[in-house]
């Protein structure tokens, strides 16, 4: 076995600054160019720290597996995926979700790797799907190698994309605001990889193949799906890599005990899928089933005010049930200072905002149902 730790430099946007990624590589002794690869990163939204804690514990487990010669596939781990956002502290408040330089949400607008892909592979594909997979991966890697940018956040995206683009399994580890455990994944992968939801104890798994936001995980699945749709009748195009976003509860849930528990769950998942030798035992009983992303709703505040929640995380509600009351502390008539906020669908209260001071249009919570909602379009609900 061989483990290496690579320090990948990023060009600093300001004089006198320098940033870097620490990348942990595990490679079995018999690895080849066609060996399976696993990529895991944490805290792309840099203020979402439960993933950073879980990956810290996962590295301990992987180091032990490496010493025991138990690692069977290439594994790449980036425990801190966003040093730019990590430094964005304003008067003691960590603002790590969006780039303060003006590029918006760090998990939006990742490279479109389908653009030009069909032309790159057109004269190289054949009847062998395994050989075609190599051709497609090589084309995507070549595309990324040719790209360049002077923008710091875009350079971060290119660097992480180059690390992840040839992986068979991609785990992007996040958390929500105030939340229970849940996942996002493409519906076509649920049957094979639902044990990840079981191991983590997820209470929801929302499925979508294209959220329309060019998020990190979809960057690596969409090219395969779009290529298959374009030329799959002519050539056998293999299934896209398994990509998933793990939401490890909420931002406050940063504890050794939870991080260790989540790391062990991910480790058992990797064992079950042949990445690490050993018997993980049977998968736990699932606490959820996969539901379409557009069966989930995020009620918005109709005005500004103070939130007073009337239902808790994990509660199941019906359409019309009272969720919260919005209080106007400046109302002249105190008796008329409250607006009732009600559920617009049946489902589970999965997450909610921590800040109780809201503006008009701010989200209140997320209710995950099973029936597709007419006003939803399979797009992400918050930015």
PLM region descriptions:
Residues 1-383:
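Structured catalytic-domain cores with a bias toward divalent-metal coordination
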């Amino acid at each position: 076995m061989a483990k290496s730790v690579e320090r990948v430099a990023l060009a600093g946007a300001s004089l006198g600054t320098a940033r870097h990624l620490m990348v942990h590589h595990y490679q079995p002794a018999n690895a080849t160019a066609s060996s399976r690869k696993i990529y895991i990163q944490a805290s792309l939204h840099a203020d979402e720290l439960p993933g950073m804690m879980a990956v810290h514990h996962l590295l301990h487990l992987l180091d032990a597996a490496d010493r025991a010669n138990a690692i069977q596939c290439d594994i790449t781990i980036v425990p801190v995926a966003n040093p730019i956002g990590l430094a964005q502290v304003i008067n003691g408040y960590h603002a790590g979700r969006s780039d303060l330089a003006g590029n918006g949400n760090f998990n939006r607008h990742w490279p479109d790797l389908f653009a030009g892909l069909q032309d790159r592979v057109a004269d190289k594909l054949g009847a062998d799907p395994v050989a075609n997979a190599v051709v497609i991966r090589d084309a995507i890697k070549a595309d990324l190698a040719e790209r360049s940018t002077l923008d710091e956040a875009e350079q971060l995206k290119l660097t992480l994309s180059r690390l992840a683009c040839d992986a068979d399994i991609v785990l992007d580890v996040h958390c929500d605001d105030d939340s229970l455990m849940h996942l996002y994944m493409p519906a076509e992968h649920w049957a094979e990889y639902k044990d990840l939801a079981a191991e983590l104890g997820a209470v929801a798994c929302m499925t979508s193949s294209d959220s329309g936001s060019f998020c990190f995980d979809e960057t690596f699945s969409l090219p395969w799906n779009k290529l298959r749709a374009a030329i799959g009748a002519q050539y056998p195009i293999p299934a896209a890599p398994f990509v998933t976003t793990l939401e490890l509860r909420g931002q406050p849930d940063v504890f050794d005990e939870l991080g260790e528990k989540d790391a062990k769950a991910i480790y058992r998942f990797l064992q079950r899928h042949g990445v690490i030798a050993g018997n993980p035992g049977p998968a736990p009983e699932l606490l959820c089933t996969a539901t379409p992303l557009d069966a989930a709703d995020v009620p918005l505040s109709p005005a500004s005010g103070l939130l007073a929640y009337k239902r808790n995380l994990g509660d199941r509600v019906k359409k019309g049930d009272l969720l919260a009351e919005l209080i106007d502390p400046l109302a002249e008539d105190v008796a008329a200072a409250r607006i009732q906020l009600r559920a617009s669908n049946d489902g589970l209260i999965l997450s909610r905002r921590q800040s109780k001071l809201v503006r008009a249009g701010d989200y209140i919570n997320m209710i995950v149902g099973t029936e597709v909602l007419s006003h939803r379009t399979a797009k992400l609900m918050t930015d």
